[in-house]
C-alpha cells in the first residue's frame, strides 16, 4: 500500500596522479632525458666483434640530425603517453591510489559523528539512455545530467579551511564531468556556493563505439586537494527512438512499474524551448533549468482516486492507468492514462509497451478529455478535441505532448571522522544487502555491495566489529555482543537498533543507510567455546560453500529470530522532509495548480 501527498515538489584543470621512475644526479637533482640516455649508454657493457669503420663528418652530421629528430619524436610520444596515463590514473579506483595514511577512528569520534551527522553527500541524477550524435551534430543529453550536494559537511569543511588560513579560492569546490572518453574533454561544473549544477553540453559521438558508458565526476578543492572521482550508473547508448511497435524482447528499452522517469516537453522540436516536469515549493511546474525524477506506478484500472493506492508489477503499456509520484517530495498527480502520440494525435486504442524517448500524453482519468499540459511555466489541464473521422483518436496541442525517459541515480555519502585526509575518498563503498548467518555466541553478518577494499571495517553504531575482506563485493564481520551497547545486559531484553557504517583506516566514515536490530531473547544463551577468530578462519578456508548454504537458509527476511539474536532493516535516507498533505484544486485551461 503506497501513501503519498496529493498534488503537491576558475579553476585550473584537475590534478592527475601518475607514477614514474626518475634518474637523479648524485646531488639529488633529476637528469634530463639526454643525460639519462648517455648515463645508460655508459653503464651498458659491450660485447662482440668490432663494428664497421666510423662514417665521414658529413655522414656523421646527417646521422646526428636524424638521431635528433627521432629523439624529439620519441619525447613527444612519451609526453603524450604520460598525459594519457595521468588522465587514466586519475580515474582509477582505490587499488591504484597512493597509500592510505592510517588514522584509526576512535569511539569518541564515531559518537560525535552520530550526534552531529555532518555528512557530505553527492548525488548524480541522469537518464538511463543517451542518444548518439552523428557526424558534426551534437545531440546533448536530455534531460541533462545533474549533480546535487546535500549534507551540512560541505559548508562545515569550507569554513574549517578558511579558519586554517586557506583563501576563498583555495577552499572553493571544483568539479569536472565527462563521459569517460579520452576523445572528449571533461567539462567544468559551476558548484561555487550552490548545491546543484547541470551539465548541459554533454554528448556522445558515433565514433565512440561503446554500447554503455558511465559519467565521471572529478571533484577537488581550489588548492588542488583531490576529493575523488564519482561515477554515475551505467547509461545505454541508442541511435534514435524506435518508431516500431515495441515488444518486451527489448526489455532494457521498456519502462517497468516502480521505476523513475523524467518528462520533458519541446515545442516545435526547438532545444531552447525544452521544459521539464518538476516539483518546487509544493507545486508542479514546467522548469527550464531543473527536472524531476518521478516514480511511475502501474495501477488497476478500477483503482479509485486516493492518497493510498495499490500498485502492480509489470511493464507500462499504452492505455494503462498510472500514478506519477515525485521521488523527492512524495507529491503525486491524479490517476492518469498514458496514451501514445502520433502527429499531435492521442491514440486511444494503442496498447504496446512504452519505450524510451517515446512521445506520449497523459489523460486525466474520469474527466472530459482533459490532458496534462504545460503553458509557459504552469502545469494546466488541456481539453482535447475529438477527431470526427477517426473516433479512436483525439487532437491535442504541443503542450500536452511529453517525451518520457527512464532515469537513474548514483549517491555517495562520506564523512572525515578524524579530520581531513590526504587520499581521495573514492571509491565510496556501497552496501546493497545484509545477511545474518549463524547464531549463539558468534553471529556473522555478510555485507554485499560494491567498491569494498581491505581497508574497511564494519561498525555497529559506535562499536567496531571484527571484519574480514572477501572481495570487492563481499565483507564478513562478527556481530558484537549486546553488552557492547548495554553494559549491564547479558542477553537482549528489548529491541535495540544500531546503524551500520563502513570506516576506512584513515577515519573516513561511509554511512550505509542500513540498521541492525537486536531482537529480544527469553534468557541468557548457553556459552559456546567457539571464538570469533576460529569462525573467521574457518570461513576464510571454506569461502564458497559455507556462505552459499548459510545465506540461502538465513537471509535478511528471517534474521530477526531470537536464536539469531538480531535483525536487519533497510531504511532509505531522505534529504528533504516530505511536505504536509494539503488540498489542491485543479483549474481548467489558462491557470495552473493552486
UniProtKB/Swiss-Prot annotation:
Pfam families: BTD (PF09270), LAG1-DNAbind (PF09271), TIG_SUH (PF20144)
InterPro entries, sorted: Beta-trefoil_DNA-bd_dom, BTD_sf, CLS_fam, Ig-like_fold, Ig_E-set, p53-like_TF_DNA-bd_sf, RBP-J/Cbf11/Cbf12_DNA-bd, RBP-J/Cbf11_DNA-bd_sf
Knockout consequences: Lethal during the first day of pupal development. At the larval stage, results in a 'neurogenic' phenotype in imaginal disks, in which too many cells adopt the sensory organ precursor cell fate. RNAi-mediated knockdown in type II neuroblasts, results in smaller cells.
Low complexity biased stretches: 58-87, 542-562, 569-580
Chain residue ranges for the region called DNA-binding: 131-141, 239-244, 266-271
Protein's GO biological process: asymmetric cell division; cell fate determination; crystal cell differentiation; hemopoiesis; imaginal disc-derived leg morphogenesis; imaginal disc-derived wing vein morphogenesis; long-term memory; negative regulation of compound eye cone cell fate specification
GO molecular function: DNA binding; DNA-binding transcription activator activity, RNA polymerase II-specific; DNA-binding transcription factor activity, RNA polymerase II-specific; histone acetyltransferase binding; RNA polymerase II cis-regulatory region sequence-specific DNA binding; RNA polymerase II transcription regulatory region sequence-specific DNA binding; RNA polymerase II-specific DNA-binding transcription factor binding
Swiss-Prot/TrEMBL keywords: Activator, Cytoplasm, Developmental protein, DNA-binding, Notch signaling pathway, Nucleus, Repeat, Repressor, Transcription, Transcription regulation
GO cellular component: CSL-Notch-Mastermind transcription factor complex; cytoplasm; nucleoplasm; nucleus; polytene chromosome; protein-containing complex; RNA polymerase II transcription repressor complex; transcription repressor complex
Bias (Polar residues) ranges: 582-594
Region named Disordered: 20-87, 542-594
SUPFAM superfamilies: DNA-binding protein LAG-1 (CSL), E set domains, p53-like transcription factors
PANTHER family per the UniProt record, alphabetical: RECOMBINING BINDING PROTEIN SUPPRESSOR OF HAIRLESS
Subunit: Interacts with activated cleaved Notch. Interacts with Hairless, this interaction preventing its DNA-binding activity. Interacts with insv (via BEN domain).
Similarity comment: family membership: Belongs to the Su(H) family.
Record's protein name: Suppressor of hairless protein
Lineage, highest ranks first: Eukaryota, Metazoa, Ecdysozoa, Arthropoda, Hexapoda
Name of the gene: Su(H)
Amino acid at each position: 500500500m503506497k501513501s503519498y501527498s496529493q498534488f503537491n515538489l576558475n579553476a585550473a584543470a584537475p590534478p592527475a596522479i601518475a607514477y614514474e621512475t626518475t634518474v637523479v644526479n648524485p646531488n639529488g637533482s633529476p637528469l634530463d632525458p639526454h643525460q639519462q640516455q648517455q648515463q645508460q649508454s655508459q653503464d651498458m657493457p659491450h660485447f662482440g666483434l668490432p663494428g664497421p669503420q666510423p662514417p665521414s663528418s658529413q655522414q656523421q652530421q646527417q646521422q646526428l640530425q636524424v638521431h635528433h629528430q627521432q629523439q624529439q619524436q620519441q619525447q613527444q610520444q612519451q609526453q603524450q603517453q604520460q598525459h594519457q596515463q595521468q588522465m587514466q590514473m586519475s580515474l582509477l579506483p582505490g587499488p591504484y591510489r597512493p597509500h592510505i595514511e592510517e588514522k584509526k577512528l576512535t569511539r569518541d569520534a564515531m559518537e560525535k559523528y552520530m550526534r552531529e551527522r555532518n555528512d557530505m553527500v553527492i548525488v548524480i541524477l541522469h537518464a538511463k539512455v543517451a542518444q548518439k550524435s552523428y557526424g558534426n551534430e551534437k545531440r546533448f543529453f536530455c534531460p541533462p545530467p545533474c549533480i546535487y550536494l546535500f549534507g551540512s559537511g560541505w559548508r562545515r569543511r569550507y569554513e574549517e579551511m578558511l579558519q586554517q588560513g586557506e583563501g576563498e579560492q583555495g577552499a572553493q569546490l571544483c568539479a569536472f564531468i565527462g563521459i569517460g572518453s579520452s576523445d572528449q574533454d571533461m567539462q567544468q561544473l559551476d558548484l561555487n556556493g550552490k548545491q546543484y549544477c547541470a551539465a548541459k553540453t554533454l554528448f556522445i559521438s558515433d565514433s565512440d563505439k561503446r554500447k554503455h558508458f558511465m559519467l565521471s565526476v572529478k571533484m577537488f578543492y581550489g588548492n588542488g586537494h583531490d576529493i575523488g572521482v564519482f561515477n554515475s550508473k551505467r547509461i545505454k547508448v541508442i541511435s534514435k527512438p524506435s518508431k516500431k511497435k515495441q515488444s518486451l524482447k527489448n526489455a532494457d528499452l521498456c519502462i517497468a512499474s516502480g521505476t523513475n522517469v523524467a518528462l520533458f516537453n519541446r515545442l516545435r522540436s526547438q532545444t531552447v524551448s525544452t521544459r521539464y516536469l518538476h516539483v518546487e515549493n509544493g507545486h508542479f511546474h514546467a522548469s527550464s533549468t531543473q527536472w524531476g525524477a518521478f516514480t511511475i506506478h502501474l495501477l488497476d484500472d478500477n483503482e479509485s482516486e486516493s492518497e493510498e493506492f495499490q500498485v502492480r508489477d509489470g511493464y507500462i503499456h499504452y492505455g494503462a492507468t498510472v500514478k506519477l509520484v515525485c521521488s523527492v517530495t512524495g507529491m503525486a498527480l491524479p490517476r492518469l492514462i498514458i496514451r501514445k502520440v502520433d502527429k499531435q494525435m492521442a491514440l486511444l486504442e494503442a496498447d504496446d509497451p512504452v519505450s524510451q524517448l517515446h512521445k506520449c500524453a497523459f489523460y486525466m482519468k474520469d474527466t472530459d478529455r482533459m490532458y496534462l499540459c504545460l503553458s509557459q511555466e504552469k502545469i494546466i489541464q488541456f481539453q482535447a478535441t475529438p477527431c470526427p473521422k477517426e473516433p479512436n483518436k483525439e487532437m491535442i496541442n504541443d503542450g500536452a505532448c511529453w517525451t518520457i525517459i527512464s532515469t537513474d541515480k548514483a549517491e555517495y555519502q562520506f564523512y572525515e571522522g578524524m579530520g581531513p585526509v590526504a587520499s581521495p575518498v573514492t571509491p565510496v563503498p556501497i552496501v546493497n544487502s545484509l545477511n545474518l548467518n549463524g547464531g549463539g555466541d558468534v553471529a556473522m553478518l555478510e555485507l554485499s555491495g560494491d567498491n569494498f577494499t581491505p581497508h574497511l571495517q564494519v561498525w555497529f553504531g559506535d562499536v567496531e566489529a571484527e571484519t574480514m575482506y572477501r572481495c570487492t563485493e563481499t565483507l564478513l564481520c562478527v556481530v558484537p555482543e549486546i553488552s557492547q551497547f548495554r553494559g549491564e545486559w547479558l542477553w537482549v531484553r528489548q529491541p535495540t537498533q544500531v546503524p551500520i557504517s563502513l570506516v576506512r583506516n584513515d577515519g573516513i566514515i561511509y554511512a550505509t543507510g542500513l540498521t541492525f536490530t537486536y531482537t529480544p531473547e527469553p534468557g541468557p544463551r548457553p556459552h559456546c567455546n567457539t571464538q570469533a577468530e576460529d569462525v573467521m578462519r574457518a570461513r576464510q578456508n571454506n569461502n564458497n560453500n559455507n556462505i552459499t548454504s548459510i545465506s540461502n537458509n538465513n537471509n535478511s527476511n528471517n534474521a530477526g529470530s531470537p536464536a539469531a539474536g538480531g535483525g536487519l532493516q533497510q531504511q532509505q535516507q531522505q534529504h528533504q522532509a516530505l511536505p504536509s498533505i494539503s488540498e489542491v484544486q485543479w483549474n481548467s485551461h489558462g491557470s495552473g495548480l493552486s
